[in-house]
Curated annotation (Swiss-Prot):
GO biological process, any: mismatch repair
Swiss-Prot/TrEMBL keywords: Cytoplasm, Endonuclease, Hydrolase, Manganese, Metal-binding, Nuclease
Residues annotated to bind a divalent metal cation: D20, E21, D117
EC number per UniProt: 3.1.26.4
Name of the protein in question: Ribonuclease HII
One GO CC annotation: ribonuclease H2 complex
Domain RNase H type-2: 14-205
The protein's required cofactors: Mn(2+); Mg(2+)
Gene field: rnhB
Function summary: Endonuclease that specifically degrades the RNA of RNA-DNA hybrids.
Family: Belongs to the RNase HII family.
Length: 205
């Protein structure tokens, strides 16, 4: 992936942030968002980041290799976490928006433009933004944010796997796999499960 999209904007803007989230669909764990700003005129091949892509298309090992490199070469980056109890209270969409806004607010310097993966965004600050469908596969800064969000969340869920070994969080990361649903049926929900996410498989409405 290249920074061609950013290059088209850099003549007039220097601080462009990509943002993306991880963890909207799981039954357990937080939703995580990341924001990344690269230096103006940054070229990925000079940093060994030309293999960057949408995090879902990358192997776990490659994501883990790329994440520290992204942090090293980014001008600014930030990650924000919204826990399951907040998700249950305000719903997953609002929690995702809050995570994205918190990530942007945590950057050491505010961006002049935000590039958002998806088709909806509700900014808290008066910063211009663009929503880009499948942006994590098209825009370098968004792809970088997707990797940081995904690796951060995976680390959280792997730790939960040690705390709650019956559930296998380190394997499915909270997503509704057959083994995860069976574990909920057998052992019930943990404190890190989202109570508002109901399971038709268990007769919940």
């Amino acid at each position: 992936m290249t920074t061609d999209y950013e290059y088209s904007l850099w003549p007039t803007l220097s601080l462009i942030s990509g943002i993306d989230e991880a963890g909207r669909g799981p039954l357990a764990g937080p939703v995580v968002a990341a924001a990344v700003i690269f230096p103006r005129w940054f070229r990925p091949r000079h940093a060994g980041l030309d293999k960057l892509d949408d995090s879902k298309k990358l192997s776990p090992n490659l994501r883990e290799q790329l994440a520290p490199t992204i942090k090293t070469f980014a001008a600014f980056w930030a990650v924000a976490v919204i826990e399951p109890d907040i998700i249950d209270r305000i719903n997953i969409f609002q929690a995702t928006m809050q995570a994205m806004n918190n990530a942007v607010a945590s950057l050491h310097q505010p961006p002049e433009l935000i590039l958002v993966d998806g088709n909806r965004f509700m900014p808290n600050a008066p910063i211009p933004y663009e929503t880009i469908v499948k942006g994590d596969a098209k825009v370098f800064s968004i792809a970088a944010a997707s990797v940081l969000a995904k690796t951060h969340r995976d680390a959280i869920m792997t730790a939960y796997g040690k705390e709650y070994p019956e559930y296998g969080f380190e394997r499915h990361f909270g997503y509704p796999t057959a083994s995860h649903i069976k574990a909920i049926e057998t052992f019930g929900r943990t404190p890190v499960h989202r109570k508002s996410f109901r399971l038709k498989q268990l007769g919940e409405k």
